[in-house]
Amino acid sequence: MLTPILVSSIFILAVVVLCFAKPNAGRIFLGIFFLVMALGVNGSFTFGNPQAYMDYASGALIPFYRTITVNIISISPFLFGLLLMAFEITMGLLLLHKHKSVKIGLLGTMLFLAGMAPLDWVQLPWLGLIVAEIHLLKHDFDRSLWETIRPGSKKGLSNA
């Protein structure tokens, strides 16, 4: 268990540093990260083994939280997975947009991270991303990813 926590912690620290050093690049990274996690991790659970959500919820650290998550997921693990994927995709796309959309995406992903933390010790380091997201909330991102990378763009990834 120590190795996944250590690897997660190093990754999270790198993302936090990126978000503080290059807020726009950090915000774009987080948006892409949530899209990849939605399609990769939750996509594989949802379409490969939706019962894994039940197994995960059954191991929640807090008994009350365990009861709530198991009761919700047990209704339909597959539907839960689809809804989780839809949420993560939506948040990822909001992070890649601009202005108020980014702020909504940041708040949504903060809630998501806080909701994941009580499920397992391995999830606790991910709360560190909230530090980066609070910092990103202070910025107004006036360009979407598309506007940042398209040819003829005046500003690139290096600008906040």
Per-segment meaning from a language model:
Residues 1-160:
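Extended, low-polarity transmembrane helix blocks
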